[in-house]
């Protein structure tokens, strides 16, 4: 469903949800503007808010089982597309399993970033030196995820960290 929204609209609106309650609140938000109903088109489940809601730092500490349970809670109250923040995706074999599970649950897409090593959320600053995964390794991870899918609708979106890590636009385009 998210793919169709993107293809058919010039602008789509999403909001971060991190548990069933925030999903329920976001599901109910609707504004009537000049006779048109405005609401959120999709939900974003970020690792930052999911981790924070669990009292944990956003360093990929919250395991996939816990994050999948959060998705179950959100899916109980909505039929809106969900975009899942998969951080670095973990090791390739785990990422393949995660993608298959997300697709089976009905999640629309996941976003993986090209960082490697201990992940530190860049929203909290760049004082901790982060490194980018080698292009070939990152590309292979995405390819293995795509091969694991049973359909065409689920999307894997690459989040390239070149600009945040001061590597420049040329590096971002290359990646």
Where are these predicted regions, by residue range?
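Alpha/beta enzyme core
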Residues: 1-175
């Amino acid at each position: 469903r998210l793919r169709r929204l993107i293809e058919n609209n010039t602008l789509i609106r999403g909001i971060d949800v991190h548990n069933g309650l925030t999903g329920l609140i976001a599901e109910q938000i609707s504004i009537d503007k000049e006779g048109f109903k405005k609401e959120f088109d999709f939900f974003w489940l970020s690792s930052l808010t999911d981790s924070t809601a669990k009292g944990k730092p956003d360093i990929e500490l919250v395991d996939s089982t816990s994050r999948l349970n959060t998705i179950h809670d959100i899916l109980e109250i909505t039929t809106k597309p969900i975009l899942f923040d998969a951080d670095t995706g973990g090791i390739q074999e785990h990422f393949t399993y995660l993608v298959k599970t997300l697709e089976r649950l009905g999640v629309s897409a996941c976003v993986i970033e090209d960082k490697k090593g201990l992940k530190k959320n860049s929203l909290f600053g760049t004082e901790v030196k982060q490194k980018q995964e080698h292009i070939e390794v990152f590309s292979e991870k995405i390819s293995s995820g795509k091969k694991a899918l049973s359909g065409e609708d689920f999307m894997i979106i690459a989040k390239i960290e070149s600009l945040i890590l001061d590597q420049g636009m040329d590096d971002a385009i290359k990646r």
